[in-house]
Amino acid sequence: MEFTAEQLSQYNGTDESKPIYVAIKGRVFDVTTGKSFYGSGGDYSMFAGKDASRALGKMSKNEEDVSPSLEGLTEKEINTLNDWETKFEAKYPVVGRVVS
């Protein structure tokens, strides 16, 4: 399934009838089983319905870092992002990709 950023934003955990999605490097993961983390009020709710690649690489929960852009990330931050991606792959199903 393909999602625009706008479509992905509809899966942000605020509508109980919809799953919760988080994208990493353009791949969309269904994180609904982690609702306590990614759902409304959860510690990582700022990632829900978005591509959180930059924020995950920087280990940041700042809204301005929640972005698909990898520009300017250090090698260490890229490695951190890759580690997060591996964790998500092991825990959550991939349901699609973000397209421009």
Swiss-Prot record:
GO cellular component: cytosol; nucleus; vacuole
N-acetylmethionine: residues bearing it: 1
Factors inducing expression: Down-regulated by auxin and cytokinin.
Assigned protein family: Belongs to the cytochrome b5 family. MAPR subfamily.
Localization annotation: Nucleus
Domain topic, free-text comment: The cytochrome b5 heme-binding domain lacks the conserved iron-binding His residues at positions 37 and 61.
UniProt-annotated stretches for the region Sterol-binding: 1-82
Keyword Calcium set for record: no
Nucleus recorded as keyword: yes
Gene3D superfamilies in the cross-refs: Cytochrome b5-like heme/steroid binding domain (3.10.120.10)
Keywords: Acetylation, Lipid-binding, Nucleus, Steroid-binding
Protein name: Probable steroid-binding protein 3
Residues annotated as domain Cytochrome b5 heme-binding: 1-82
Gene Ontology MF terms: steroid binding
